[in-house]
């Protein structure tokens, strides 16, 4: 693993060599999904993740659109920051919405991979991400 500081990380183990990824990637959880992860220590994801065969994540620049598209109007959500370097070779960057590359984990997410998790409040009909969200 090669790490380049400047709010990004170059990780040779994931995808093509030199692919720049953020140090942190993000997962939006419903309350019961977050509670289950805390209780069991790992998850295979939400129903959509199980259907697709991988756990969906977003970068910081993709997360608001993900919230708007998949969680519009939903309350009791949490956003978790995941250290991408802890996920190993199961993390793949794949083209998805609008031709953008999204991080997908082929495997389980462990609670030890979570750097922090905070409530994602609904403010005036839109989810408001925390200040520490980078």
Predicted regions and their residues:
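N-terminal amphipathic/basic-hydrophobic helices that include classical n-h-c signal peptides
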Residues: 1-22
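Conserved, structured core segments of small domains
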Residues: 23-134
């Amino acid at each position: 693993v090669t790490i380049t500081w400047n709010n990004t990380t170059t990780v040779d183990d994931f995808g093509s060599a030199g692919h720049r990824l953020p140090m942190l990637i993000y997962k939006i959880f419903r309350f019961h999904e977050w509670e289950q992860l805390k209780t069991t220590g790992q998850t295979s994801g939400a129903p959509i993740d199980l259907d697709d065969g991988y756990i969906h994540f977003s970068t910081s620049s993709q997360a608001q659109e993900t919230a708007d598209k998949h969680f519009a109007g939903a309350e009791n959500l949490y956003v978790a920051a995941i250290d991408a370097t802890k996920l190993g070779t199961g993390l793949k960057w794949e083209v998805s919405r609008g031709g953008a590359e999204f991080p997908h984990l082929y495997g389980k997410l462990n609670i030890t991979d979570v750097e922090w998790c905070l409530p994602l409040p609904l403010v005036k009909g839109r989810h408001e991400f925390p200040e520490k969200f980078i």
